[in-house]
Amino acid sequence: MILQANCGTTAMGIMPHSDIEQALELALGLDIPFWPQLPNVSLYEDMYVQTSEHFPGITIDFERGRLVFSTARFQEELEDYYTKMEHPETYALTTEYSRVFKKFLSRDLQGYKAIRGQITGPVSFGFKVLDETFKPIIYNEEAKTILFDFIQKKANVQYQELKAKNQNAFVWVDEPGLGYVFSGLSGYNDQHAKEDYYNFIQGLEGPKGLHLCADVNLPYLLELGIEILSFDAFQIGFMPKEYAGSVSEFLKKGGVISWGIVPTESSILLIQTPEKLASTLSNYWEVISDNTGLALRQIAEQALIAPARCCLRDIGTETTGKCEIPNVEEKIVEKAFSFLQEISQILREKFEL
């Protein structure tokens, strides 16, 4: 097994907090803590901006809060990049681009069963960053080739830094944009992405993790060569029988699944309880077990429990038309984190972990 999961708790990296220490304390309260990404602290803490550090051709537009890619600048900076591409410091996350990461590394992290980092994946980054013609850089073959290698190296440098603090470290690749490849309009289809991604994943050091909070195709994701999958389990509503075989095979090979079962929209979280969510997750697992024969206890042993998504904006308040509550997103995340511990305890007792 990649790690001893046993229904332990973790969460995705992005948090709405503007207080670094408060966010860190919440993250460090989980079984597998992580370093938070806090875009409300600074644009440098944004997941895309952090990943862009030292990528040729990219500048930050602080006024518009976005990254800008210039094809001409890319060509100008390529030669210098090639001279530095084998140097680890080219890929290290500096204090300027994440005060939080350095603060996380300054803590004593040896006592945890594992610790985790994250990095924006090449597909999401490639779709998000546009050139001067507003075309995603994933369609620029030269930029795309460098991008996959660049992010792979950044993930590996981060992994080594985390491993120095805890031997059971891992970095998962955050890929909210991976769902785009199933759109017939994307021009970068699922098969092309699968080939690129498999090679990318194989070059990652340590446990190979992937996080996706968009609509998911579990069999597709589980065939990418990963060892840890984190996904929004709440939004699927039920476990399709057609997915059971793929999930079972993944777990039989020692894989770990982080089930994002706690919703982070206020209107939905309001009507949920830890007991109801634990029951929902148990029902998913029963579908897998009933259709494959895989023991429920094994599924639980190889499960992590997490929020469904990050919460930078409370969609629940927007859709219900309620008045805005100060720091409502922070309160939602804190409530979701408290649910995690209770759900974990319920499942550990149920499956005698």
Predicted regions located by residue number:
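Glycoside hydrolase catalytic-domain groove-lining segments
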Residues: G237-P263
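Alpha/beta catalytic barrel-like cores
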Residues: M1-P136, G255, T273, V287-G293, ...
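Glycine-rich anion/phosphate-binding loops
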Residues: P88-L105, E141-V157, K276-V287
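Active-site beta-loop-alpha junctions enriched in small/polar residues
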Residues: T120-P122, P176-L178, C213-N217, F234-I236, ...
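A short, acidic, amphipathic alpha-helical segment used as a generic capping/interface helix at domain edges
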Residues: P240-V247, T273-Q298
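Glycine-enriched alpha-helix->loop->beta-strand junction motifs that scaffold or abut catalytic
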Residues: L30-D31, E223-S230, L251-I257
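Active-site clefts of carbohydrate-active enzymes
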Residues: G254-A278, P307-G316
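Active-site loop segments of alpha/beta catalytic cores
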Residues: A114-G117, P136-G245
